[in-house]
Structure formats: C-alpha cells, structure tokens
C-alpha cells in the first residue's frame, strides 16, 4: 500500500471519498510519522493525538453518511500563532506559558467546519519575529533538506518554519501559516513547498496572535500549487470579528489550476536585481521567464522605483506596531508571571523573563520610533514610503501587467546558528529584501519551488499579483510547477 503520508491533499481527498482507507488510518499514519521525526526536526511544539483521532472518526462518519466537507479527514498542522480552543497557543514564547484559549481563530474554525483534522501546533519564530525559526522558546526547527554530502543542520526559514518543515517532511498534509514580511513565502522557498500570502483582508485575522496588524495575513503552506489553492479556498472568508476582513466572495481557486496563460502580461522588476545576488538565483529567475513565455505569457520589464526604501521602512512600521500589540503581555491574567516588589516591578520582571532577545529588540525599536521626538522623523516618514511603494505597484498594474515574477530569497537555506547572521541582526533582516514590499502594499504573493541550487537545496520564485486576484497567481505558479517539477527531501531523520 502507498505510504499514506506521501499523498497530496487532492489525492487523499479522492481516496477518502472512494473509501480506499479511512480518515482514522490517514491520521494514524501522520501521527506515527511525527513520532518518528519530531525529535530530529522539532517541527511540532504540541501534539493533539486524541483530538485528532476523535476528529478523524467524526470525518469517517460524515464520509459514510455522504455529508463530507471539502477537507474531510485531511490532517493539518497549525502554526502556534492561531488560537485553538483548549489547546496550547503560545506564539512559541515563554511569556505565554500555559496559555490555552477559550475560543478558536476564524481561519482554523473554517478548516474544522470543512472536516479537516488537527494534528497539533507547529513551531515558529517567537511572536512570528524572525527569518530562521531560531528565536522560538522551544528551540530551532531543523530543515528536512540537507546539502549534498553534508550533515550540517539548516534552518527552514521563518517565521513559519515549523509549518514549512512539517509539510516538506510529510508530517502533515498541509499547514496554516502567517506572513508579515515574508514568513510564508521564505520558508516555503527554503523547503521546496508552496506558500501563498493572500491579499490583506482575504483571510480573517481574528484569533491570530498579532505582530504588526496592518501587515499580518494568514495563508497556507502546501506540497503543491493545487493543494495551496484547496486550502486557501477554505481558510478565506469574510468575518465580522475582523474589521479589516474584506466582504468579497471567495472564488474556487482550484479551478484556476491548468488555465492558459495566453494573453497574460508578466512584469520583471529591474530593482530586484540587487548587488551581490547569487548567480544561481539570477539564472533561475531567467529560467522562470522562459517557462512563462513558453506557456504563452508576454513578459515585460517594469520599474518599482521605491523598492530600495522598503526594508528600512518595514523595520520601522512593523516594530512600531509590535511594540503596541505586545504591550498587553504583562503577567497579570495569563502566561508567565514573575513576582516583584510591586505591580510595576512584576510587569518589568515578567516581560524581561518572558520575551526573547529578538522580540525585546523589536519592541525597543518600535517604542523608540513612536516616541515623541522621533515619531515624525521615523514612523511618519516610513508610512509615506509605504504609500509610495503601494503606488509603484498600482502604476505597473494600471499599465496592464497582470502579475510580477521575482526572486523570493537571496540564497538557499543557511546553517542553524550561522555566526555572521546571529551577530548582525541587519544581515538577518536582509533575508526579507524580496518579500516585504508585498506586505507593505497589501498584495498577494506566492512562492513556488523552481529548482535546486548547486548544493542540492531548493530555491523558489515569487509571483506577486493584483489585490484579490489570487487565481492569476495560482494558474501562473502551476505553469512554473509543470516546468520545474516537484521537490521532496531525501529522508535522513
């Protein structure tokens, strides 16, 4: 019999309907795979085997009665940023020790309503702040990929590193993730998986622990483009509990898979050719252009002139919002409490002990740029830059461009504990150089695997689309996937 965990969501869905195996058998196969691998990969921080089996049994009953949902019996992993009722939800931070919410995030509720099964909570950078999944209170996630002939441990990217690693290693059929500055797309590129950050407002943010509220957006990480389309259809919804949720019908994204690219105009932004870009990334980008031309698309050069200001502007706006959002964690009602001589001392000690170094750094930067003497010089200026970045994209789309093809990462996955990156936060922040403009402009962005580098590690390409035109990204990404093939790591764990 086929290894059940090797099936895509689309394949598992059909075989479950045909009763080739039960949802319980599929769930047990994933739980066994997690037991065997999680010690080596550290992708999950909390497992829910009893809940998973109960959900799978209920799925089998619905399949038998002919009332199956769209994701009936499909086992998923959930990033630890999503509130899951009565289940560990800590944003992988010490400050939220023991927190189990009494409510469910809208995105996960949508998935359970369609029959999906929860396997557990996935590791991530603390409060989603990081590009390597090394800032988690639970330790780093290890990328299931290794360089040819090497045993060196590599990062899976961040902040959704647990989601990407679990999907790549077949420890779940798909996973929820979030993207504030590249946290879906960069880990997907590092692990040979597909990740989409939808348009801001497409998925509800209710029940997702906030990092930077004007940038955060939920999306799926999956094994292929079709699976990502299937997941996004269920994750997306209008939600009165999120004031930024957009009241637009959710298309059947899966129908976009396989559609022709004839008549589609793809833009190539010259500003993404940065100094020191590895030749392999440059070559892959050129190959992507050829694949899209071969598929019938027209490819044109475009300019996004304010791209070079995006990184500094992002690292003002995001920490500013984070410093405000994270002010609520004080040890009073839930999470870690460190006693002090008075309430102010208790606040200070709880926050100092509860937040990790990177989170503290961003809170301090955010507090600084919002302070009286610096608000106009930094925060206000960064918001003006953000408007200009958004306008760049609007101008390009107004000229008839349907989607943009760009690199997603400046390199393939790097080593866990890389000393150069660990000693210089700005070098780590540069990992986001190709991804943050999408968040600043609120646009949809998709990462699709496009090849392997000389070391045998996956590289991805990024597609950027018009607001709420995710279907264009799915059909374009599918054309790249057809040309490039799919990539699975050799099992060493």
Swiss-Prot record:
Keywords: ATP-binding, Ligase, Nucleotide-binding, Protein biosynthesis. GO terms for biological process: translation. Gene3D superfamilies: Amidase signature (AS) domain. Its EC number is 6.3.5.7. The keyword Lipid metabolism does not apply. It catalyses: L-glutamyl-tRNA(Gln) + L-glutamine + ATP + H2O = L-glutaminyl-tRNA(Gln) + L-glutamate + ADP + phosphate + H(+). GO terms for cellular component: glutamyl-tRNA(Gln) amidotransferase complex. The keyword Nucleotide-binding applies. The active site is at residues 79, 159, 183. InterPro entries: Amidase, Amidase_CS, Amidase_dom, AS_sf, GatA. It holds the Pfam family Amidase. Heterotrimer of A, B and C subunits. Allows the formation of correctly charged Gln-tRNA(Gln) through the transamidation of misacylated Glu-tRNA(Gln) in organisms which lack glutaminyl-tRNA synthetase. The reaction takes place in the presence of glutamine and ATP through an activated gamma-phospho-Glu-tRNA(Gln). Belongs to the amidase family. GatA subfamily. NCBIfam families: gatA (TIGR00132). This is Glutamyl-tRNA(Gln) amidotransferase subunit A. It comes from Agrobacterium fabrum (strain C58 / ATCC 33970) (Agrobacterium tumefaciens (strain C58)).
């Amino acid at each position: 019999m086929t290894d059940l965990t090797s099936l895509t969501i689309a394949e598992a869905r059909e075989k479950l309907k045909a009763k080739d195996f039960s949802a319980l058998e599929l769930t047990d196969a994933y739980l066994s795979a997690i037991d065997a691998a999680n010690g080596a990969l550290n992708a999950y921080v909390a497992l829910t085997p009893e809940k998973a089996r109960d959900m799978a049994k209920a799925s089998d009953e619905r399949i038998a009665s002919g009332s199956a949902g769209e994701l009936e019996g499909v086992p998923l992993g959930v990033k630890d940023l999503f509130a899951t009722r009565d289940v560990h939800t800590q944003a992988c931070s010490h400050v939220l020790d023991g927190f189990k919410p009494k409510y469910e995030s809208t995105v996960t509720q949508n998935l359970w309503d369609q029959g999906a099964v929860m396997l557990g909570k996935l590791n991530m950078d603390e409060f989603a702040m990081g590009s390597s999944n090394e800032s988690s209170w639970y330790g780093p996630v290890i990328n299931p990929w290794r360089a040819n002939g090497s045993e060196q441990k590599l990062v899976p990217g961040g902040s959704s590193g647990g989601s990407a690693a679990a999907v790549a290693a077949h420890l779940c059929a798909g996973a929820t993730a979030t993207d504030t500055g590249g946290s879906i797309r960069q880990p997907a590129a590092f692990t040979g998986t597909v990740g989409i950050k939808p348009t801001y407002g497409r998925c509800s943010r209710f029940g997702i622990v906030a990092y930077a509220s004007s940038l955060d957006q939920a999306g799926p990480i999956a094994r292929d483009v079709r699976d990502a389309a299937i997941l996004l259809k269920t994750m997306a919804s209008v939600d009165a509990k999120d004031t930024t949720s957009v009241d637009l019908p959710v298309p059947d994204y899966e129908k976009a898979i396989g559609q022709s690219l004839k008549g589609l105009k793809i833009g190539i932004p010259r500003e993404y050719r940065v100094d020191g870009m590895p030749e392999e990334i440059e070559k892959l980008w050129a190959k992507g252009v050829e694949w899209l031309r071969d598929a019938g698309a027209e490819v044109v050069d475009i300019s996004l002139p304010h791209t070079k200001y995006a990184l500094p502007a992002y690292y003002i706006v995001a920490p500013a919002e984070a410093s405000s959002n994270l002010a609520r964690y004080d040890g009073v009602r839930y999470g870690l409490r460190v006693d002090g001589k008075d309430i102010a001392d208790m606040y200070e000690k709880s926050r100092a002990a509860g937040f990790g170094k990177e989170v503290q750094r961003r809170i301090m930067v955010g507090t600084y740029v919002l302070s009286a003497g610096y608000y106009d010089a930094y925060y206000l200026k960064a918001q003006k830059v953000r408007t200009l970045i958004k306008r760049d994209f609007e101008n390009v789309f107004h000229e008839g461009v349907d989607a943009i093809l760009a690199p997603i990462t400046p390199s393939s996955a790097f080593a866990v504990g890389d000393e150069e990156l660990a000693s210089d936060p700005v070098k780590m922040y540069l990992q986001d150089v190709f991804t943050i403009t999408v968040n600043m402009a609120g646009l949809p962005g998709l990462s699709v695997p496009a090849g392997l580098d000389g070391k045998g590690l996956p590289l991805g390409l990024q597609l950027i689309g018009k607001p709420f035109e995710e279907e264009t990204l799915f059909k374009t990404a599918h054309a790249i996937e057809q040309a490039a093939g799919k990539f699975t790591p050799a099992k060493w764990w």
